Amino acid sequence: QDSENQGTYTSAVLGSGVPILIKIGEEYIESAELLSFITDKKIYEYPDVVFSTTIKNLGNTHISPIGEISITNIFGQEIDRIKFNESSQSLLRENSGIYEDEWYNKALLSEENKVMFGPMKANLVSTYRTISPGFAPLTAETTFWIIPWKIILGTATAIVLLILILRKKKK
């Protein structure tokens, strides 16, 4: 044995498993309430928005809310649509869960040349029923602003400098 490492022992035990949710019994109640649908900030420089949705499971079985978040601009044009709870994360009975979904775009114009700055509106439409057929929507709306202030400041500075230069040349 190496005398330098004598008495030193490291062990790592790794384990993994897949959680399995089983429904037992006959009387399932699927009921949920949408407690909040908000963004992490009210003003953004670029479309890098995190939507946070809190849902409370009021039923006696687990649910997996899924849906879509549609984003519209100042002109009411839908500029993007993202999945809500794309991973289908379940919510156990009598618990609340917070779901975070991100909308990210580097541009200020959509692929269809729709404006992606100014006041924006996001609409969430989610469903959660799996056992009995039917439509049980959870809907909410939130607003936020996208203000590219660096671009605005740079443009305004350039305009002011241009005006000052033109005035000096006229004199």
Set out the residue ranges of the language-model regions.
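A short beta-strand micro-motif common to beta-rich folds, especially ectodomain repeats
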Residues: 1-4
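C-terminal edge beta-strand
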Residues: 8-11, 17-22, 140-144
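A general structural signal for short secondary-structure junctions and capping/turn motifs
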Residues: 11-12, 134
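Functionally constrained cores in energy, signaling, and assembly domains
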Residues: 16, 30, 101, 167-169
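Membrane-proximal extracellular "stem/stalk" segments
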Residues: 25-154
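Alpha-helical membrane-embedded segments
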Residues: 155-161
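C-terminal membrane-anchoring or membrane-association module
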Residues: 161-171
